[in-house]
Amino acid sequence: MTIDSGFNHITVLLDEAVEALALRADGCYLDGTFGRGGHSRLILSKLGPQGRLLGFDKDPQAIATGQALAAEDGRFVIVQRSFAELGAEVAARGLHGKVSGVLLDLGVSSPQLDDPERGFSFLNDGPLDMRMNPDQGVSAAEFIATAPVEEIARVFKEYGEERFAGRMARAVVERREKQPFTRTADLAEVLKVANPAWEKGKNPATRAFQGLRIHVNNELGDLEAGLEAALDALEVGGRLAVISFHSLEDRIVKLFMRKLVKGEADNLPRNLPVQHKVFEPKIKLIGKAQFASEAELKANPRSRSAVMRVAEKLR
């Protein structure tokens, strides 16, 4: 597979995210969402000869890019796995509790959105796929073809936050009984007609497509598992930086960090004898949530929804 697909990706919050990791020259770091390697390359430029960086991605095109980088720089290794599985990879490499920092840059990348053949976009017609790894799992077309109307509506509503989810799901099922969906443009058109109240400046298929993508790739489940695995992998004093792009992701990150700042006692039954340390925070927050600067927004409008939260492990 060619590495240069012709679709460019501008890394969001590049300097801010790498700075948030408080890099040590000899540290071991994880880039849980390698993508096209923007963050990884900057991290490597700041590491010394003893530093190490382990990258994760599900996307075969990202893996090809990562393999090329690994061939150039022996401090870097790329792994084709979801960051939700980083715990197993870290354990296999003897790095549990020894990682100095973890970076997660969530969501879909610009090359994935802009390449019609990946099936993520309602703007460019392509096969209705949406899988980060096209070799694994059920495609969006397969899900739409077989799921009950109630399940399609749930995905649109729960993951896409689409208020007309039921109406749009019924329109999808009515159309699939006549002709199956195989192309993104066909689905987008049906969703467009079924949506009675278009949001200004937003394509009426936007929320439903987001819901489908999140469901097909189990993005929220992976995020919850990945956050826990990242915290376990970190050494005391290690940093976790997470960039999210919509409210569902950010809510999970915010609640995860808030719970650990408070300590674990809130999650235990009342009157249960516990050791004092469970009342102590497991992490501390580093600064407030960060957003793209005006300069970055101007250069890359897609950064407008990005929010980064950073935490440091205390115990």
From Swiss-Prot:
EC number(s) given by UniProt: 2.1.1.199
Record-listed S-adenosyl-L-methionine binding positions: G37, G38, H39, D57, F83, D105, Q112
SUPFAM superfamilies, per the entry: Putative methyltransferase TM0872, insert domain (SSF81799), S-adenosyl-L-methionine-dependent methyltransferases (SSF53335)
UniProt GO cellular component terms: cytoplasm
A biological process term (GO) from this entry: rRNA base methylation
Gene3D superfamilies: Putative methyltransferase TM0872, insert domain, Vaccinia Virus protein VP39
Pfam family, one: Methyltransf_5
Keywords noted in UniProt: Cytoplasm, Methyltransferase, rRNA processing, S-adenosyl-L-methionine, Transferase
Reactions this protein catalyses: cytidine(1402) in 16S rRNA + S-adenosyl-L-methionine = N(4)-methylcytidine(1402) in 16S rRNA + S-adenosyl-L-homocysteine + H(+)
Localization (cell): Cytoplasm
Major location category of this protein: cytoplasm
GO molecular function: rRNA (cytosine-N4-)-methyltransferase activity
Family to which the UniProt record says this protein belongs: Belongs to the methyltransferase superfamily. RsmH family.
Function: Specifically methylates the N4 position of cytidine in position 1402 (C1402) of 16S rRNA.
HAMAP family given in the database record: 16SrRNA_methyltr_H
Protein name: Ribosomal RNA small subunit methyltransferase H
UniProt source species: Pseudomonas putida (strain ATCC 47054 / DSM 6125 / CFBP 8728 / NCIMB 11950 / KT2440)
